[in-house]
Regions:
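Hydrophobic alpha-helical transmembrane segments
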Residues: 45, 56-71
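Intrinsically disordered, low-complexity coil segments
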Residues: 82-94, 112, 163-174
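Charged, low-complexity intrinsically disordered regions
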Residues: 100, 104, 108-162, 170-323
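Transmembrane-cytosolic junction motif
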Residues: 36-40, 73-102
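Alpha-helical transmembrane segments
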Residues: 51-54, 70-77
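Transmembrane alpha-helical segments and their cytosolic interface motifs
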Residues: 37-55
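Cytosolic juxtamembrane N-terminal segments of multi-pass membrane proteins
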Residues: 1-42
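Alpha-helix boundary/N-cap detector
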Residues: 3-7, 20, 94, 98, ...
Length: 323
Protein backbone atom coordinates (compact mmCIF):
# COMPACT_ATOMS: atom_id res chain seq x y z
CA UNK A 1 0.00 0.00 0.00
CA UNK A 2 1.45 3.38 -1.03
CA UNK A 3 1.79 6.30 1.37
CA UNK A 4 -0.92 8.20 -0.51
CA UNK A 5 -3.40 5.33 -0.18
CA UNK A 6 -2.50 4.85 3.48
CA UNK A 7 -3.21 8.53 4.20
CA UNK A 8 -6.52 8.28 2.33
CA UNK A 9 -7.53 5.27 4.43
CA UNK A 10 -6.65 7.11 7.65
CA UNK A 11 -8.76 10.09 6.56
CA UNK A 12 -11.70 7.78 5.80
CA UNK A 13 -11.38 6.06 9.16
CA UNK A 14 -11.25 9.39 10.99
CA UNK A 15 -14.43 10.56 9.22
CA UNK A 16 -16.15 7.34 10.26
CA UNK A 17 -14.99 7.75 13.88
CA UNK A 18 -16.30 11.32 14.01
CA UNK A 19 -19.60 10.25 12.48
CA UNK A 20 -20.01 7.40 14.97
CA UNK A 21 -19.23 9.71 17.90
CA UNK A 22 -21.94 12.23 16.98
CA UNK A 23 -25.12 12.21 19.13
CA UNK A 24 -27.28 12.22 16.00
CA UNK A 25 -25.68 9.04 14.70
CA UNK A 26 -25.80 7.32 18.08
CA UNK A 27 -29.55 7.89 18.19
CA UNK A 28 -29.95 6.48 14.66
CA UNK A 29 -27.86 3.46 15.62
CA UNK A 30 -29.92 2.89 18.76
CA UNK A 31 -33.16 2.87 16.76
CA UNK A 32 -31.68 0.63 14.06
CA UNK A 33 -30.50 -1.87 16.67
CA UNK A 34 -33.90 -1.87 18.34
CA UNK A 35 -35.64 -2.46 15.00
CA UNK A 36 -33.37 -5.37 14.12
CA UNK A 37 -33.74 -6.95 17.56
CA UNK A 38 -37.50 -6.61 17.60
CA UNK A 39 -37.68 -8.25 14.16
CA UNK A 40 -35.86 -11.27 15.58
CA UNK A 41 -37.97 -11.37 18.73
CA UNK A 42 -41.23 -10.94 16.83
CA UNK A 43 -40.43 -13.90 14.60
CA UNK A 44 -39.56 -16.07 17.62
CA UNK A 45 -42.64 -14.98 19.55
CA UNK A 46 -44.98 -15.73 16.64
CA UNK A 47 -43.61 -19.25 16.32
CA UNK A 48 -43.80 -19.80 20.09
CA UNK A 49 -47.38 -18.47 20.21
CA UNK A 50 -48.59 -20.75 17.41
CA UNK A 51 -46.92 -23.85 18.85
CA UNK A 52 -48.05 -22.99 22.38
CA UNK A 53 -51.65 -22.47 21.26
CA UNK A 54 -51.73 -25.82 19.45
CA UNK A 55 -50.30 -27.66 22.47
CA UNK A 56 -52.58 -25.96 25.01
CA UNK A 57 -55.65 -26.50 22.85
CA UNK A 58 -54.75 -30.19 22.46
CA UNK A 59 -54.36 -30.54 26.22
CA UNK A 60 -57.16 -28.35 27.56
CA UNK A 61 -59.45 -27.67 24.58
CA UNK A 62 -61.23 -24.28 24.86
CA UNK A 63 -59.58 -23.50 28.22
CA UNK A 64 -56.19 -24.00 26.58
CA UNK A 65 -57.12 -21.52 23.88
CA UNK A 66 -58.07 -18.96 26.54
CA UNK A 67 -54.77 -19.51 28.37
CA UNK A 68 -52.86 -19.00 25.11
CA UNK A 69 -54.78 -15.78 24.42
CA UNK A 70 -53.96 -14.43 27.89
CA UNK A 71 -50.27 -15.32 27.56
CA UNK A 72 -50.21 -13.77 24.09
CA UNK A 73 -51.69 -10.54 25.40
CA UNK A 74 -49.16 -10.38 28.27
CA UNK A 75 -45.99 -11.32 26.38
CA UNK A 76 -46.58 -10.98 22.63
CA UNK A 77 -48.84 -7.94 22.33
CA UNK A 78 -46.29 -5.50 23.89
CA UNK A 79 -43.72 -6.62 21.31
CA UNK A 80 -46.26 -6.20 18.50
CA UNK A 81 -47.21 -2.73 19.77
CA UNK A 82 -43.59 -1.59 19.96
CA UNK A 83 -42.94 -2.99 16.47
CA UNK A 84 -45.83 -0.92 15.11
CA UNK A 85 -44.47 2.20 16.84
CA UNK A 86 -41.00 1.69 15.38
CA UNK A 87 -41.94 0.78 11.82
CA UNK A 88 -45.33 2.49 11.47
CA UNK A 89 -46.60 1.43 8.04
CA UNK A 90 -43.12 0.74 6.65
CA UNK A 91 -42.06 -2.92 6.69
CA UNK A 92 -38.29 -3.44 6.77
CA UNK A 93 -36.66 -6.78 7.44
CA UNK A 94 -33.18 -7.08 8.95
CA UNK A 95 -31.57 -7.52 5.55
CA UNK A 96 -32.87 -4.11 4.44
CA UNK A 97 -31.99 -2.49 7.76
CA UNK A 98 -28.42 -3.82 7.77
CA UNK A 99 -27.56 -3.51 4.08
CA UNK A 100 -29.43 -0.36 3.01
CA UNK A 101 -29.73 1.59 6.26
CA UNK A 102 -26.43 0.66 7.92
CA UNK A 103 -23.85 -0.41 5.31
CA UNK A 104 -24.87 1.77 2.36
CA UNK A 105 -24.13 5.06 4.21
CA UNK A 106 -20.65 3.67 5.01
CA UNK A 107 -20.09 2.96 1.32
CA UNK A 108 -20.98 6.58 0.54
CA UNK A 109 -18.22 7.72 2.89
CA UNK A 110 -15.79 5.79 0.66
CA UNK A 111 -17.45 6.28 -2.73
CA UNK A 112 -19.90 9.23 -2.61
CA UNK A 113 -21.91 7.79 -5.52
CA UNK A 114 -21.71 4.19 -4.31
CA UNK A 115 -24.59 2.25 -2.79
CA UNK A 116 -25.67 -1.11 -1.44
CA UNK A 117 -29.05 -2.70 -1.91
CA UNK A 118 -30.72 -5.97 -0.99
CA UNK A 119 -32.15 -6.82 -4.43
CA UNK A 120 -29.56 -6.93 -7.26
CA UNK A 121 -30.37 -5.72 -10.77
CA UNK A 122 -28.09 -8.20 -12.59
CA UNK A 123 -29.59 -9.75 -15.72
CA UNK A 124 -29.97 -13.50 -15.35
CA UNK A 125 -28.88 -14.59 -18.85
CA UNK A 126 -25.27 -13.31 -18.63
CA UNK A 127 -25.04 -14.54 -15.02
CA UNK A 128 -25.86 -18.05 -16.26
CA UNK A 129 -22.90 -17.81 -18.65
CA UNK A 130 -20.43 -17.70 -15.73
CA UNK A 131 -22.16 -20.20 -13.43
CA UNK A 132 -22.62 -23.97 -13.51
CA UNK A 133 -25.86 -25.15 -15.09
CA UNK A 134 -28.62 -24.92 -12.51
CA UNK A 135 -32.38 -24.47 -12.15
CA UNK A 136 -32.64 -21.98 -9.28
CA UNK A 137 -30.66 -18.76 -8.90
CA UNK A 138 -30.87 -16.54 -5.82
CA UNK A 139 -28.98 -13.25 -5.88
CA UNK A 140 -28.75 -10.89 -2.92
CA UNK A 141 -26.87 -7.86 -1.58
CA UNK A 142 -25.45 -5.84 -4.46
CA UNK A 143 -22.57 -3.43 -3.90
CA UNK A 144 -22.29 -0.82 -6.69
CA UNK A 145 -19.35 1.58 -6.69
CA UNK A 146 -20.58 3.64 -9.67
CA UNK A 147 -16.94 4.33 -10.51
CA UNK A 148 -15.38 4.77 -13.95
CA UNK A 149 -15.78 1.05 -14.70
CA UNK A 150 -19.30 0.79 -13.16
CA UNK A 151 -18.11 -2.06 -10.95
CA UNK A 152 -20.82 -4.01 -9.10
CA UNK A 153 -20.77 -7.27 -7.17
CA UNK A 154 -23.56 -9.45 -5.81
CA UNK A 155 -23.84 -12.66 -3.82
CA UNK A 156 -25.27 -15.63 -5.70
CA UNK A 157 -26.54 -19.03 -4.62
CA UNK A 158 -27.57 -21.47 -7.35
CA UNK A 159 -29.01 -24.92 -6.73
CA UNK A 160 -31.13 -27.74 -8.09
CA UNK A 161 -33.35 -30.27 -6.32
CA UNK A 162 -32.86 -34.03 -6.62
CA UNK A 163 -35.65 -36.45 -5.78
CA UNK A 164 -34.99 -40.03 -4.69
CA UNK A 165 -37.17 -42.95 -3.62
CA UNK A 166 -36.09 -45.53 -1.05
CA UNK A 167 -36.94 -49.24 -0.95
CA UNK A 168 -40.16 -48.51 0.94
CA UNK A 169 -41.40 -46.13 -1.73
CA UNK A 170 -40.78 -42.99 0.32
CA UNK A 171 -39.74 -39.97 -1.71
CA UNK A 172 -37.22 -37.44 -0.43
CA UNK A 173 -35.96 -34.18 -1.91
CA UNK A 174 -32.41 -32.92 -1.54
CA UNK A 175 -31.14 -29.45 -2.41
CA UNK A 176 -27.81 -29.63 -4.26
CA UNK A 177 -25.59 -26.54 -4.37
CA UNK A 178 -24.30 -25.65 -7.84
CA UNK A 179 -22.76 -22.26 -7.05
CA UNK A 180 -22.13 -20.30 -3.86
CA UNK A 181 -20.12 -17.12 -4.16
CA UNK A 182 -20.02 -13.78 -5.97
CA UNK A 183 -20.66 -12.43 -9.46
CA UNK A 184 -18.98 -9.22 -10.62
CA UNK A 185 -20.16 -6.92 -13.40
CA UNK A 186 -18.12 -4.11 -14.93
CA UNK A 187 -17.57 -2.20 -18.14
CA UNK A 188 -14.83 -3.65 -20.32
CA UNK A 189 -12.35 -0.91 -21.40
CA UNK A 190 -12.81 -1.65 -25.10
CA UNK A 191 -15.76 -2.90 -27.10
CA UNK A 192 -15.43 -6.65 -27.60
CA UNK A 193 -16.44 -8.14 -30.96
CA UNK A 194 -18.77 -11.06 -30.30
CA UNK A 195 -18.26 -12.75 -26.95
CA UNK A 196 -15.86 -14.94 -24.99
CA UNK A 197 -16.47 -17.38 -22.13
CA UNK A 198 -13.65 -18.70 -19.99
CA UNK A 199 -14.99 -21.35 -17.61
CA UNK A 200 -13.34 -23.76 -15.15
CA UNK A 201 -13.17 -27.47 -15.80
CA UNK A 202 -12.11 -30.27 -13.46
CA UNK A 203 -10.40 -33.52 -14.38
CA UNK A 204 -10.58 -36.81 -12.52
CA UNK A 205 -7.27 -37.93 -11.04
CA UNK A 206 -7.20 -41.31 -12.86
CA UNK A 207 -8.89 -40.89 -16.24
CA UNK A 208 -8.11 -37.18 -16.69
CA UNK A 209 -11.66 -36.92 -18.00
CA UNK A 210 -13.35 -33.53 -17.89
CA UNK A 211 -16.13 -33.22 -15.34
CA UNK A 212 -17.93 -30.01 -16.15
CA UNK A 213 -21.25 -28.59 -14.99
CA UNK A 214 -20.79 -25.25 -16.75
CA UNK A 215 -22.61 -24.73 -20.07
CA UNK A 216 -20.58 -26.37 -22.84
CA UNK A 217 -19.92 -25.20 -26.40
CA UNK A 218 -22.88 -23.23 -27.73
CA UNK A 219 -24.07 -22.55 -31.27
CA UNK A 220 -21.67 -20.32 -33.26
CA UNK A 221 -18.93 -20.72 -30.62
CA UNK A 222 -15.37 -21.94 -31.16
CA UNK A 223 -13.38 -23.82 -28.53
CA UNK A 224 -9.77 -22.67 -28.44
CA UNK A 225 -6.63 -23.55 -26.47
CA UNK A 226 -3.77 -21.36 -25.35
CA UNK A 227 -0.02 -21.92 -25.15
CA UNK A 228 -0.39 -22.13 -21.37
CA UNK A 229 -0.72 -25.89 -20.70
CA UNK A 230 -1.81 -25.35 -17.11
CA UNK A 231 -4.57 -23.01 -18.27
CA UNK A 232 -5.81 -25.57 -20.81
CA UNK A 233 -6.04 -28.20 -18.07
CA UNK A 234 -8.15 -26.05 -15.77
CA UNK A 235 -10.19 -23.85 -18.15
CA UNK A 236 -12.22 -24.15 -21.34
CA UNK A 237 -12.39 -21.17 -23.69
CA UNK A 238 -15.37 -20.61 -25.97
CA UNK A 239 -15.60 -17.58 -28.28
CA UNK A 240 -17.23 -16.24 -31.42
CA UNK A 241 -14.17 -14.25 -32.60
CA UNK A 242 -10.86 -16.09 -32.19
CA UNK A 243 -8.72 -13.03 -32.96
CA UNK A 244 -10.39 -10.92 -30.25
CA UNK A 245 -10.26 -13.82 -27.81
CA UNK A 246 -6.53 -14.40 -28.25
CA UNK A 247 -5.87 -10.68 -27.97
CA UNK A 248 -7.72 -10.65 -24.66
CA UNK A 249 -5.93 -13.75 -23.33
CA UNK A 250 -2.53 -12.10 -23.02
CA UNK A 251 0.12 -13.40 -20.56
CA UNK A 252 -1.08 -11.03 -17.82
CA UNK A 253 -4.65 -12.33 -18.01
CA UNK A 254 -3.47 -15.96 -18.14
CA UNK A 255 -1.32 -15.38 -15.04
CA UNK A 256 -4.38 -13.89 -13.32
CA UNK A 257 -6.37 -17.03 -14.10
CA UNK A 258 -3.57 -19.32 -12.89
CA UNK A 259 -3.40 -17.40 -9.61
CA UNK A 260 -7.14 -17.73 -9.06
CA UNK A 261 -7.17 -21.48 -9.73
CA UNK A 262 -5.85 -22.13 -6.22
CA UNK A 263 -8.22 -19.65 -4.57
CA UNK A 264 -11.59 -20.31 -6.20
CA UNK A 265 -13.34 -21.46 -9.35
CA UNK A 266 -13.36 -18.37 -11.55
CA UNK A 267 -15.21 -17.78 -14.82
CA UNK A 268 -15.45 -14.83 -17.22
CA UNK A 269 -17.96 -13.78 -19.84
CA UNK A 270 -17.49 -10.70 -22.05
CA UNK A 271 -19.96 -9.44 -24.61
CA UNK A 272 -19.79 -6.04 -26.29
CA UNK A 273 -18.55 -3.74 -23.51
CA UNK A 274 -19.72 -5.62 -20.42
CA UNK A 275 -17.76 -8.20 -18.43
CA UNK A 276 -19.12 -10.70 -15.90
CA UNK A 277 -16.84 -12.59 -13.53
CA UNK A 278 -17.88 -15.31 -11.09
CA UNK A 279 -15.99 -16.64 -8.07
CA UNK A 280 -17.12 -19.80 -6.31
CA UNK A 281 -15.91 -18.82 -2.83
CA UNK A 282 -18.24 -20.91 -0.69
CA UNK A 283 -19.36 -17.89 1.35
CA UNK A 284 -21.42 -14.72 1.07
CA UNK A 285 -20.23 -11.15 1.52
CA UNK A 286 -21.87 -8.85 4.07
CA UNK A 287 -23.82 -11.46 6.09
CA UNK A 288 -26.63 -9.98 8.20
CA UNK A 289 -26.17 -10.31 11.99
CA UNK A 290 -28.49 -13.09 13.07
CA UNK A 291 -28.55 -12.79 16.86
CA UNK A 292 -29.45 -10.11 19.39
CA UNK A 293 -25.88 -10.26 20.74
CA UNK A 294 -24.37 -9.62 17.29
CA UNK A 295 -26.73 -6.68 16.75
CA UNK A 296 -25.76 -5.15 20.10
CA UNK A 297 -22.11 -5.27 19.01
CA UNK A 298 -22.69 -3.41 15.73
CA UNK A 299 -20.12 -0.65 15.38
CA UNK A 300 -19.77 1.81 12.52
CA UNK A 301 -15.97 1.77 12.78
CA UNK A 302 -15.67 -2.02 12.89
CA UNK A 303 -18.12 -2.53 10.02
CA UNK A 304 -16.23 0.10 8.02
CA UNK A 305 -12.99 -1.85 8.48
CA UNK A 306 -14.61 -5.06 7.23
CA UNK A 307 -16.35 -3.29 4.35
CA UNK A 308 -13.18 -1.46 3.31
CA UNK A 309 -11.25 -4.75 3.31
CA UNK A 310 -13.89 -6.35 1.06
CA UNK A 311 -13.89 -3.37 -1.32
CA UNK A 312 -10.07 -3.44 -1.50
CA UNK A 313 -10.23 -7.15 -2.36
CA UNK A 314 -12.89 -6.55 -5.02
CA UNK A 315 -10.90 -3.72 -6.60
CA UNK A 316 -7.67 -5.72 -6.51
CA UNK A 317 -9.41 -8.73 -8.05
CA UNK A 318 -10.73 -6.70 -11.00
CA UNK A 319 -7.85 -4.23 -11.38
CA UNK A 320 -6.27 -5.80 -14.48
CA UNK A 321 -9.51 -5.42 -16.44
CA UNK A 322 -9.87 -1.69 -15.84
CA UNK A 323 -8.90 0.93 -18.37
Amino acid sequence: MTEEIRESREEELERIRQLEASPEYQEKLRILREKMKINIRWKMYKIALVLGTVMLFAMFKFVGFVIAAVLGFIYVYPVYKRKQELFREKKENNEVLYVERFLSPIVKEIFPTGEMKVTPDFLLDPVKKVCPSSTNYRGNTELSLHDSSELSVMNLYAYHVVESTDSKGRTSRKEVTDFYGQVFRMQFPKSFAGHIRVIPTERTAILKREVQDYPGKQKNELKIDTEDIRHNEHYNIFCTDEFMARRFLNPTVLDWFDKNISESQTAIYIEDSTMYISRYTGYQLFPVPGTVEAIDQLSLVEEYKKLRAEIDLIESFTEIFKA
